[in-house]
């Protein structure tokens, strides 16, 4: 009897864990953050956990926010803004690595779907930016740095500490989808393929096999914006 109860307990625990940490093919779907808050977010669990000397992150976002907001927040256990993608305003993005940031500017339309990619190479410190398949100006930061592992990766909020410290005035409101991350710098040809909807086997975060945890009022819905809508800005 005790053995049966023990097995039942293990089964219930396993079920709860599966609900909390789902691995799902999210092709054609988006995370929707419907409101400004400090409680609504999605935690992403990486497939590969290692210190990073190179990376590429790509995703699609659709929002009508005009205030500053976080798009991708990756914090290490010790330190702040280990890897942060932040949007200050229309046509202005910030990339932070090891709590040092750089800004990039370009042409965007308000409340238009955006496909965004950024990559960074430690050996040169060069960060590249691509918006709707078009390259923006390259910048440099944190040459020789290594992005720490064991991250807390959050969508919908900006972390001021490891896994928390949220501010509703920095929260994201809108849709995020097709988020993938690699431990390498993708070539321009590969970036264009990703922009066209080819994921190219991401090994850190894979939208087609994503581990995530939903928190607060965040939901999954079919993507209503066609991929062709992301090439309005050229």
UniProtKB/Swiss-Prot annotation:
<keyword id="KW-0011">Acute phase</keyword>
<feature type="glycosylation site" description="N-linked (GlcNAc...) asparagine">
    <location>
        <position position="54"/>
    </location>
</feature>
<comment type="subunit">
    <text>Homopentamer. Pentraxin (or pentaxin) have a discoid arrangement of 5 non-covalently bound subunits.</text>
</comment>
<dbReference type="GO" id="GO:0045087">
    <property type="term" value="P:innate immune response"/>
</dbReference>
<dbReference type="GO" id="GO:0046872">
    <property type="term" value="F:metal ion binding"/>
</dbReference>
<keyword id="KW-0106">Calcium</keyword>
<keyword id="KW-0430">Lectin</keyword>
<dbReference type="GO" id="GO:0005615">
    <property type="term" value="C:extracellular space"/>
</dbReference>
<feature type="domain" description="Pentraxin (PTX)">
    <location>
        <begin position="27"/>
        <end position="226"/>
    </location>
</feature>
<keyword id="KW-1015">Disulfide bond</keyword>
<feature type="binding site">
    <location>
        <position position="170"/>
    </location>
    <ligand>
        <name>Ca(2+) 2</name>
    </ligand>
</feature>
<comment type="similarity">
    <text>Belongs to the pentraxin family.</text>
</comment>
<feature type="binding site">
    <location>
        <position position="81"/>
    </location>
    <ligand>
        <name>Ca(2+) 1</name>
    </ligand>
</feature>
<dbReference type="GO" id="GO:0001849">
    <property type="term" value="F:complement component C1q complex binding"/>
</dbReference>
<dbReference type="InterPro" id="IPR051005">
    <property type="entry name" value="Pentraxin_domain"/>
</dbReference>
<dbReference type="InterPro" id="IPR013320">
    <property type="entry name" value="ConA-like_dom_sf"/>
</dbReference>
<keyword id="KW-0964">Secreted</keyword>
<feature type="binding site">
    <location>
        <position position="159"/>
    </location>
    <ligand>
        <name>Ca(2+) 1</name>
    </ligand>
</feature>
<feature type="signal peptide">
    <location>
        <begin position="1"/>
        <end position="22"/>
    </location>
</feature>
<feature type="binding site">
    <location>
        <position position="160"/>
    </location>
    <ligand>
        <name>Ca(2+) 2</name>
    </ligand>
</feature>
<dbReference type="GO" id="GO:0030246">
    <property type="term" value="F:carbohydrate binding"/>
</dbReference>
<feature type="binding site">
    <location>
        <position position="158"/>
    </location>
    <ligand>
        <name>Ca(2+) 2</name>
    </ligand>
</feature>
<keyword id="KW-0034">Amyloid</keyword>
<dbReference type="GO" id="GO:0006953">
    <property type="term" value="P:acute-phase response"/>
</dbReference>
<feature type="binding site">
    <location>
        <position position="158"/>
    </location>
    <ligand>
        <name>Ca(2+) 1</name>
    </ligand>
</feature>
<dbReference type="InterPro" id="IPR030476">
    <property type="entry name" value="Pentaxin_CS"/>
</dbReference>
<feature type="disulfide bond">
    <location>
        <begin position="58"/>
        <end position="117"/>
    </location>
</feature>
<feature type="binding site">
    <location>
        <position position="160"/>
    </location>
    <ligand>
        <name>Ca(2+) 1</name>
    </ligand>
</feature>
<dbReference type="InterPro" id="IPR001759">
    <property type="entry name" value="Pentraxin-related"/>
</dbReference>
<keyword id="KW-0732">Signal</keyword>
<protein>
    <recommendedName>
        <fullName>Serum amyloid P-component</fullName>
    </recommendedName>
</protein>
<keyword id="KW-0325">Glycoprotein</keyword>
<keyword id="KW-0479">Metal-binding</keyword>
<dbReference type="Pfam" id="PF00354">
    <property type="entry name" value="Pentaxin"/>
</dbReference>
């Amino acid at each position: 009897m005790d053995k049966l109860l023990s097995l039942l307990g293990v089964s219930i625990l396993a079920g709860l864990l599966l609900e909390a940490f789902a691995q799902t093919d999210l092709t054609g779907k988006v995370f929707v953050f419907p409101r400004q808050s400090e409680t609504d977010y999605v935690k992403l669990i990486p497939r590969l956990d290692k210190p990073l000397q190179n990376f590429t992150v790509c995703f699609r976002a659709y929002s009508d926010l005009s205030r500053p907001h976080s798009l991708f927040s990756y914090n290490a256990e010790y330190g702040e803004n280990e890897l942060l993608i932040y949007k200050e305003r229309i046509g202005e993005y910030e990339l932070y690595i090891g709590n040092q940031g750089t800004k990039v500017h370009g042409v965007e339309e308000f409340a238009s779907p955006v496909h965004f990619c950024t990559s960074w190479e430690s050996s040169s410190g060069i960060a590249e930016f691509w918006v709707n398949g078009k390259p923006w100006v390259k910048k440099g930061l944190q040459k020789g740095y290594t992005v720490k592992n064991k991250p807390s990766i959050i969508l919908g909020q900006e972390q001021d500490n490891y896994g928390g410290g949220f501010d509703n005035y920095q929260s994201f409101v809108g849709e995020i989808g097709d988020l993938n991350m690699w431990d390498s710098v993708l070539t321009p040809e590969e970036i264009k393929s990703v922009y066209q909807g080819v994921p190219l086997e991401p090994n850190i975060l894979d939208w087609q096999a994503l581990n995530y945890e939903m928190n607060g009022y965040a939901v999954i819905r079919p993507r209503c914006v066609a991929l062709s809508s992301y090439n309005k800005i050229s």
